[in-house]
Each structure stands twice: as structure tokens, then as C-alpha cells.
């Protein structure tokens, strides 16, 4: 079920938005279920701010990230974390190293005798039919939602091995050093590593003592890393925990994005036409029931809260 708000300015939208958040909280409390409010990606709906109401359950389709020391909470599509710097080292000259048969980060880490945090991971994507080179520290994973938002594309997928090969890159030893003809997206984690090991774009070889941005630069440097359990909270430095959950509500500050495309406006007191400022609010009626069953059942079966029970 969806609802919308229409206001004359951003301040009015914030009031409407906050009222709906409070209304949702009270609704779920009356339903007898416990929810967590998390920062969320706006997705295809768009807008500049959105929050999800998540019912925590191991069977949930979403992953959320919570801090164990403060109130930070976010869907993993949106979650951020504080990057931990590798110990400071003086930058050394790059060297080619023979690495026969080494194709993965774990294999490279074992072969070189270094942690994955001392490597550079190269990942290739097709973004609206353009091959994108992504470079991130080897101990981290790419958050594809963040990457898609950074690129502002409608279609994003992993490039196939054939596409990587056709682009002139060596799978398992692709290098951001000296690469040409691609947009290179770098995660800021590379600035927190020193003398890293990266591909050499030559079969059976890698480069050691690679430093960013000394040895290569990026077209875009932006957070594209997936926040995971054990990472540091971006607010307080506490430890992040991950949980599965079901989304049962989602609220958005749409702003004027839809009123501009629909040419929806109003006349103010001075007779000046201005864009309507919109909000959007979704609630999953069926998901509330499913969530209650997941959260409240015991060994004897379903334990419905009285307010949503089909019978006494």
C-alpha cells in the first residue's frame, strides 16, 4: 500500500516525512512486531533520502548493518564504514614478480605471503555496454548498488570472461597500472594501503610495491565497498554487525524529481508557479503478517499478536 505527500517546500516535506515515520512506528508497535529503522538506497524510485523498516529474521531477503555501540543502522546497499589503514610504509619501487598459475586474490595472498589487505583486486563490469575497470583493496568486496549509483547507469552486471579477454585484459592478472581505454573506478581503501600487490596484465606475473595514486590514477574515486561484519562504524568507530531481515515499510523524500518530470506545480501567494515537493510512503500489509509469523512463532506454531490475530 502506498501513500504520497505534497508540500510547498523542503521544510514541509520534512514535517510530512517525520510524521509518516512516527505513524509507521506506532502501527508496527500496535501490530506487536519489532522493527529497526535503517538508512536505505532509494533505488529506481529515486529521491535524496529514504529509510526502511526492517523486521529482523534469519529468513529475510535483506541484509542490514547495525553498530554495536551507537544507533547507526543501514541497509547493506547503503551502509558505510571507517576504513582501517595498513601500517605506514615508505613507498618502494614497483617490481614484476613471476606468479605462475596464480589467478585469485586468495592464491596471490598465499603465494606472496601477505594478507589480502596488501593486494589490489580488479573487478570488471559491463555498465550500459561499457566495460568498467574497478580497483579495490583485496580484503574488501564491491557493493554493486554503490557502483551503479556512482556510474549513474541503468544496467550493471559482471563482465564475462570473454568480454574481459576481448578488451585485451589478462584475467587473474589484470592491472590498473598503465591501463588505457577504460573508465577506472577506485575505492578510497587503496589510499590506506602501501606497497600493494596487483596484476601486471601479463600472464604469470604480478606487480609488487604498487601505490595509489603514485602508480595509477582513477576516473572516479568513490566509496564502492560493501560494509561487512567486523568493520568499523563510520560514526563512533564501534564494531558493525550484520543481520537478515524483511522490509515491511519504506519511506522516501522524493523532492521535486517527479514533479519536474510531470510538470506538477502550484501557484504561491505571489502567483509564482513552483514545483510540488513530494514524499512517497510504502507499507507491506502482507509482509507484516509474514513477518509476525517469522518473529513470533514458537515450537508449537504461530503466535499471532492480538491486534492482527484472525480470531481470539
Predicted feature locations:
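Extended, low-hydrophobicity, polar/charged segments
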Residues: 1-288, 295, 299-306
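Short, intrinsically disordered, charge-balanced linker/junction segments flanking boundaries
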Residues: 307-312
Amino acid at each position: 500500500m502506498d501513500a504520497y505527500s505534497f508540500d510547498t517546500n523542503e521544510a514541509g516535506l520534512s514535517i510530512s516525512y517525520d510524521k509518516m515515520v512516527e505513524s509507521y512506528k506506532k502501527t508496527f508497535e500496535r501490530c506487536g512486531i519489532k522493527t529497526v529503522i535503517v538508512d536505505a538506497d532509494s533505488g529506481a524510485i529515486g529521491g535524496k533520502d529514504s529509510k526502511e523498516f526492517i523486521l529482523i529474521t534469519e529468513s529475510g531477503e535483506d541484509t542490514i548493518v547495525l553498530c554495536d555501540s551507537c544507533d547507526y543502522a543501514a541497509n547493506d546497499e547503503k551502509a558505510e564504514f571507517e576504513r582501517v589503514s595498513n601500517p605506514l610504509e615508505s613507498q618502494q619501487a614497483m617490481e614484476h614478480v613471476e606468479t605462475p598459475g596464480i589467478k585469485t586474490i586468495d592464491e596471490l595472498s598465499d603465494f606472496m605471503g601477505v594478507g589480502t589487505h596488501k593486494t589490489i583486486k580488479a573487478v570488471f563490469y559491463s555498465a550500459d555496454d561499457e566495460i568498467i575497470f574497478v580497483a579495490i583493496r583485496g580484503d574488501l568486496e564491491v557493493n554493486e548498488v554503490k557502483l551503479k549509483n556512482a556510474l549513474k547507469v541503468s544496467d550493471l552486471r559482471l563482465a564475462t570472461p570473454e568480454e574481459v579477454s576481448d578488451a585485451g585484459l589478462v584475467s587473474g592478472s589484470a592491472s590498473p597500472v598503465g591501463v588505457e581505454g577504460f573508465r577506472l573506478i577506485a575505492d578510497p581503501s587503496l589510499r590506506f594501503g602501501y606497497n600493494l600487490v596487483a596484476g601486471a596484465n601479463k600472464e604469470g606475473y604480478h606487480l609488487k610495491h604498487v601505490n595509489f595514486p603514485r602508480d595509477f590514477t582513477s576516473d572516479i574515486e568513490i566509496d564502492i565497498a560493501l560494509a561487512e561484519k567486523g568493520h568499523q562504524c563510520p560514526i563512533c568507530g564501534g564494531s558493525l554487525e550484520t543481520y537478515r531481515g524483511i522490509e515491511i515499510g519504506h519511506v522516501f523524500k522524493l523532492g521535486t524529481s517527479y514533479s519536474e518530470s510531470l510538470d506538477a506545480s502550484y501557484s504561491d501567494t505571489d502567483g509564482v508557479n513552483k514545483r510540488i515537493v513530494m514524499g512517497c510512503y510504502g507499507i507491506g500489509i502482507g509482509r507484516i503478517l509474514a513477518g509476525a509469523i517469522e518473529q513470533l512463532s514458537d515450537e508449537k506454531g504461530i503466535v499471532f499478536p492480538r491486534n492482527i490475530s484472525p480470531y481470539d
